Amino acid sequence: MSFVDLEQGRHKIEQNGDFPALASSIAQEIHALRGNTAAIHRYLVNNLTKNLHEVLEQSRELSQKVRSDLVRLANIKDTKYGEEASSFALSKLTRDFNTVLAELQRVQQKCAQQESDSVAAAQAALNQDVGQHFIEEEERNVSLSNNSSGQRQPLTESKISNSQLEYQQRLINERQGEIENLTQGINELNEIFRDLSTIINEQGELVTNIEYNVGNTSTNTKNASRQLQIANEHSRKARKRSFCFLVILVVILGVILTALIMG
């Protein structure tokens, strides 16, 4: 499914209060995708194949779902949640998803390379077996021909049968199909990366404005705090001057009263 399909109806903004619930669901999906990616990495390190392709397919479907949900989230306008909070939440989820996708793509590419190397080795071994089988069949035909002419020679048993060769070829074909699926999955991840860049670019201007406003608020708060400190300093100095003036006035009055009493 292309991003264009997901974008249909984008001009019609959803008016509901599902933003927090959907954002929480996306966060859980990203967490699950991160766990799958770690599991795939363990499979590769330990050279395990059981359940590997099931986890790969599950991760592929989960990636598509997260992409779809992020588009839905970008379309939601939740007045209760707030535009700034919504924008920051969407931006964080998008970046988290982008990080997980990059790691998933890396392990998928490694998986495809290992699978390709293994298939190439298996095909080379099969080609050798086919060649050996052909030689043995020719030798058997010669022996049968000699036996029919009265020259008896022991017949050698072929080391590998046609059915075994066909079975090995089917296994190789299946693994080649898995490589094609891996390649398709990697291409789908590239499409998702492009979609994420679109979402990030659309949110970028709003996030920049919000960050600018937050920066201004922080600057204004610091300025206000500084002005308050200056005002407190002036007030303290003014109180000190008033106290000094009062002391001087008391001293003067004391001198005058003393003079009057003594006079």
UniProtKB/Swiss-Prot annotation:
Keywords of this entry: Endoplasmic reticulum, Phosphoprotein, Protein transport, Transport
Species this protein is from: Schizosaccharomyces pombe (strain 972 / ATCC 24843)
Keyword Chloroplast on entry: no
Designated name of the protein: Syntaxin pep12
Gene, per the UniProt record: pep12
Modification type Phosphoserine: residues: S148, S163
InterPro entries linked to this entry: SNARE, Syntaxin, Syntaxin_N, T_SNARE_dom
Compartments reported by the entry: Endoplasmic reticulum
Top-level taxonomic group: Eukaryota
GO biological process terms on file: Golgi to vacuole transport; intracellular protein transport; vesicle docking; vesicle fusion
Organism phylogeny: Eukaryota, Fungi, Dikarya, Ascomycota, Taphrinomycotina
Annotated spans, Disordered: 140-159
GO CC annotations on file: endomembrane system; endoplasmic reticulum; fungal-type vacuole membrane; Golgi apparatus; late endosome; SNARE complex
Domain t-SNARE coiled-coil homology: 169-231
GO molecular function: SNAP receptor activity; SNARE binding
Biased composition (Polar residues): 142-159
Known role: Has a role in vesicle-mediated transport but not with protein transport from Golgi to vesicle.
